[in-house]
Structures are given as C-alpha cells and as structure tokens.
Amino acid sequence: MKKKNNIILTIQKNCKNTKNIPKKYIFEKWIKKVLYKKKNVNLINIRIVDEREMKNINLKYRGKNKSTNILSFKFDLFINKNQTLLGDLVLCKKIIEKESLKYQKTLESRWAHMIIHGTLHLLGYDHKNKKEKKIMEKIENKIMLFLNYEKPYFMKSS
C-alpha cells in the first residue's frame, strides 16, 4: 500500500512580516515532488527568518558574514524503521522577495525553487563543481517544469 503523506513538516516563522509566505500544504506539495521516490516518512523543519538572523546563521555555520536565500542542514538521522529526520531548511523571506524581482520570477516560483533546491541538498545533492551543479540544476528545472513553473535556470541544450 502506498503511503499518502511521506513527510512531516514543521514551519517556524521568525520574521516581522509573514505576509506572502506560502501555506504549509504548498511547501508540502513542493517537497513531495522532490521526495517522490522516498518510502520512509521524512521529517523536515523549515525556519523562515529575517536578514539579520540569516546573516548570523551563515556566519556561524559557513563563515560568511552575509545573509543568503537558503541554508540546508542535512541530518539524515534514522529515527525508527519508518522515519528519517532529513534536516532543516532556513529561508530568508526578504532575500527571496528581492530575488523574485531581480530574476523576474513570480514570488511563488522563487519560493518553490528555493524549497526544491534546499530539499535536494538534504538528499545529498550539491553544486560545488561544474558536474554536480549541472546535475542539480537539471533536476531543479525538471521539477519546476513538472509543477508548471518556469525553469529557474536556462540551460543550453546539448
């Protein structure tokens, strides 16, 4: 029997303005598209923060004294035979809003892309070199198109 819901999602909002943050079921929809092959129940925590908190977290964990759009903290902690804590996604609302304008994407599309990108990191994907980056971007493009959003990356056809 197929499991109906393969994620347990908690969301913390730690920013003054919570307007235009997607609803929990929307986050779940995006994450499920990334985790569609996973059989376990996967626990993910999302924390939505302001630029100051993001800057502090980025400095503490990556040594970078600036805010960023998303940080992923992979745990992949086996809780029991049916549950895995995949990790945490920390998103900066203000930067996502700025980037949606900068890249001329809808705000919803930018949120979707960041959640997909972060969830792929929780699964072990990365973009530290050209080969990894190409693989990850191809998956992100495919999922975004499947969800009826524009490609976040415009890739040259090979």
UniProtKB/Swiss-Prot annotation:
Cofactor binding, note field: Binds 1 zinc ion.
Record's protein name: Endoribonuclease YbeY
Subcellular location: Cytoplasm
Binding of Zn(2+), residues: 117, 121, 127
Enzyme Commission number(s) of this protein: 3.1.-.-
Cofactor: Zn(2+)
A single Gene Ontology CC term: cytoplasm
Biological processes annotated in GO: rRNA processing
Taxonomic superkingdom: Bacteria
Name of the top EC class for this enzyme: hydrolase
Chief localization: cytoplasm
Cysteine disulfide links: none
Function of the protein: Single strand-specific metallo-endoribonuclease involved in late-stage 70S ribosome quality control and in maturation of the 3' terminus of the 16S rRNA.
GO MF annotation list: metalloendopeptidase activity; RNA endonuclease activity; zinc ion binding
